[in-house]
C-alpha cells in the first residue's frame, strides 16, 4: 500500500502588511502586501510560485523563512506553529535563497561551510558535503578562495544556491534562482531540483517568471496577483499558454483567467 504524503507546511489565512516607513520611522497608513493566503505543502512537492510584479511572491518566501512575521494568520511546519519554533531551529529546516546573493565579505569556502558549522558537522563531513555539491553544480575549486567582488553576478548566484543546498534542508525556498545563469546551467539546476526529494528528502518552493523552467520543474503551481492567491493547481491542471497570456495582461490590468 502506497504511503500517503504528509502535510509538511500549512498556511491558514496569512496576511502581511507594511506599517512603517523604513527611512523616517513615521507611521503610515497600513497597506496590505499579502491577503488571506491559505495552502498546504506536501512533503516532496516542487511548488512554483508565479504572478506579475508586485504580487507579493518574495514576501511570501520571507514569511516562510521568518524574515518577516505575518500580520494575521498562522503558519505551521509539521504541525508546529511557526512562532513556537526557535528561529535558529526553523532555519535549519527551512532554507531561503534570496534573489540578490550576498556573501558578507566571506570567501566562497567560508560562505559554504558556515551553515554546516552551525549544524555541528565535523571538518571531514563539511569537506565531503562541499565537494559533493560543488561537483553537482560544477563549481570549480579555484572559486573557493574568492570573495564576492571576485565573482560575476551569475557566479555569485550559483554560490548562493549552493549555500542553500549544502545544508540539505527539509524545505528549500528559492527566489528567482536562475535569473542570471546561462541555459546549460539553468537546465542542470532544474534537473538537480527535480531529484532533491528522491536523494535528500527536500521539498522545494520556487518563485520564477520563466514558465518553460516551471513546466520542467513543478508538481504544483501557485499564482499570486495583488497579494492574493488566485489559483492553486497541480501542474497537470495548468494551461501554460493561458498562464503566459495572463501574466502579460496582469502587468497592465486586473483580468485573471487561465
What are these regions (language model features)?
Residues 172-176:
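Catalytic Walker B motif of ABC-type/P-loop ATPase nucleotide-binding domains
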Residues 147-151, 155:
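Conserved ABC ATPase signature
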Residues 228-251:
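Conserved beta-strand-loop-alpha-helix hinge in the C-terminal portion
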Residues 125-142:
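Conserved ABC ATPase "signature" region
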Residues 208-209:
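H-loop/switch region of ABC-family ATPase nucleotide-binding domains
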Residues 65:
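Helix-to-loop junction immediately C-terminal to a conserved catalytic motif
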Residues 73-81, 90:
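Conserved ABC transporter NBD signature motif
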Amino acid at each position: 500500500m502506497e504511503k500517503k504524503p504528509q502535510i509538511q507546511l500549512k498556511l491558514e489565512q496569512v496576511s502581511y502588511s507594511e506599517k512603517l516607513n523604513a527611512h523616517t520611522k513615521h507611521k503610515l497608513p497600513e497597506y496590505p502586501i499579502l491577503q488571506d493566503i491559505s495552502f498546504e505543502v506536501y512533503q516532496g512537492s516542487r511548488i512554483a510560485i508565479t504572478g506579475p510584479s508586485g504580487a507579493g511572491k518574495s514576501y511570501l518566501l520571507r514569511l516562510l523563512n521568518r524574515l518577516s512575521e505575518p500580520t494575521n494568520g498562522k503558519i505551521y511546519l509539521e504541525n508546529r506553529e511557526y512562532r513556537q519554533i526557535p528561529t535558529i531551529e526553523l532555519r535549519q529546516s527551512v532554507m531561503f535563497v534570496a534573489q540578490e546573493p550576498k556573501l558578507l565579505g566571506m570567501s566562497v569556502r567560508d560562505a559554504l561551510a558556515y551553515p554546516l558549522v552551525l549544524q555541528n558537522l565535523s571538518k571531514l563531513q563539511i569537506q565531503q558535503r562541499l565537494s559533493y555539491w560543488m561537483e553537482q553544480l560544477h563549481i570549480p575549486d579555484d572559486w573557493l578562495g574568492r570573495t564576492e567582488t571576485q565573482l560575476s553576478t551569475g557566479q555569485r548566484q550559483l554560490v548562493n544556491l549552493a549555500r542553500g543546498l549544502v545544508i540539505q534542508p527539509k524545505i528549500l525556498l528559492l527566489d528567482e534562482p536562475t535569473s542570471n545563469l546561462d541555459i546549460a546551467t539553468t537546465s542542470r539546476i532544474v534537473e538537480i531540483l527535480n531529484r532533491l526529494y528522491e536523494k535528500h528528502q527536500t521539498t522545494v518552493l520556487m518563485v520564477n517568471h520563466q514558465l518553460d523552467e516551471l513546466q520542467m520543474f513543478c508538481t504544483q503551481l501557485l499564482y499570486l496577483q495583488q497579494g492574493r492567491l488566485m489559483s492553486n493547481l497541480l501542474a497537470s491542471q495548468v494551461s501554460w499558454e493561458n498562464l503566459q497570456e495572463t501574466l502579460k495582461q496582469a502587468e497592465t490590468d486586473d483580468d485573471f483567467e487561465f
